């Protein structure tokens, strides 16, 4: 983990404050060009989600994402064209999370490598507790720019530093989310982390997404170029529903299933997604959102 200094006077400017459901610090705009240790993928996914949320026909309601994006002065066009895929993934995580929170409303949600996600404000039921785990630069940025809550804590550690588990109150249930994380890890690290969660959080759940084999291989061999200026990082871990037996073999895992496709925007996209999820022979081509239940 690399530490960064707080932005200097030349990196921020005061603008009028805005009101949110939670307490908000005075409105600042930070210069994203000077961030050190903040992954560009965090800015990319924020931009994609906020752009979708700002559409009149957007598939996700995320005003905090729009606010956060606007508080970071950055050339988002650097990432190329926007699309709904990132918001579609977030919508799937919201659906899976709400299913668990409907039964365990006071559960602790642990968001691993949360980046600049804003899931807490979309899911907050007034009772849950939230632990945001990420490296120090991201944690500092979140604390500077996002609303606060007495039920929202941060932990400046890697998801692979299992000491974050000591901060989790499991009395009312635990939901661990890994949104946009596992594909950037080595396979052994992913399975070790899942096994550690299963051992530690009996009765809890894990939700994660992954990419299919062809996309992983392409990203490593040729690079996934999203624009002339930006190429996505390599994704060494791939995983589809065809590999679920590997998870079922881990001690402490009760059940594994794939989240059905959430609704997308547009007739063509919606029809293609339904077809992709309806045909078993296409399971190896999907980028699934997987739910793991711990015994």
What are these regions (language model features)?
Residues 176-177:
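A conserved beta-strand element that flanks and buttresses the S-adenosyl-L-methionine
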Residues 217-234:
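Short, glycine-/aromatic-enriched active-site segment of Class I SAM-dependent methyltransferases
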Residues 2, 13-110, 114-157, 170:
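Rossmann-like AdoMet
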Residues 235-260:
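Short alpha-helix
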Residues 200-213:
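Conserved beta-strand signature within the Rossmann-like core of class I S-adenosyl-L-methionine
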Residues 184-196:
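A short, conserved alpha-helix within the catalytic core of class I
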Residues 251-278:
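Conserved catalytic loop of SAM-dependent methyltransferase domains
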Residues 162-171:
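Short amphipathic alpha-helix with an adjacent loop that forms part of the alpha/beta core around
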């Amino acid at each position: 983990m690399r530490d960064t200094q707080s932005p200097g006077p030349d990196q921020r400017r005061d603008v009028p404050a805005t009101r949110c459901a939670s307490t908000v610090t005075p409105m600042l705009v930070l210069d994203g060009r000077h961030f050190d240790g903040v992954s560009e993928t965090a800015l990319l996914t924020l931009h994609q989600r906020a752009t979708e949320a700002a559409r009149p026909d957007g598939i996700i309601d995320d005003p905090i994402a729009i606010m956060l994006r606007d508080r970071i002065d950055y050339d988002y066009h650097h990432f190329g064209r926007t699309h709904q895929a990132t918001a579609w993934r977030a919508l799937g995580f919201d659906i899976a999370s709400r299913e668990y929170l409907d039964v365990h409303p006071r559960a602790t949600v642990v968001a691993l490598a949360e980046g600049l996600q804003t899931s807490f404000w979309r899911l907050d039921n007034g009772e849950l507790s939230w632990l945001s785990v990420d490296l120090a630069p991201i944690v500092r940025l979140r604390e500077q720019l996002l609303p606060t809550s007495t039920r929202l804590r941060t932990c400046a550690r890697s998801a692979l530093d299992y000491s974050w588990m000591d901060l989790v109150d499991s009395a009312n249930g635990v939901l661990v989310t890994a949104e946009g994380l596992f594909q950037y890890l080595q396979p052994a690290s992913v399975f070790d982390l899942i096994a550690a969660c299963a051992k530690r959080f009996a009765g809890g759940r894990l939700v994660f997404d992954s990419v299919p084999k062809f996309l992983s291989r392409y990203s490593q061999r040729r690079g996934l170029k999203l624009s002339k200026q930006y190429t996505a990082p390599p994704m060494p871990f791939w995983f589809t529903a065809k590999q679920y037996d590997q998870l079922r073999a881990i001690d402490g895992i009760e059940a594994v299933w794939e989240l059905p496709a959430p609704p997308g925007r547009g007739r063509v996209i919606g029809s293609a997604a339904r077809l992709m999820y309806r045909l078993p022979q296409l399971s190896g081509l999907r980028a699934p959102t997987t739910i793991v239940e711990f015994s």
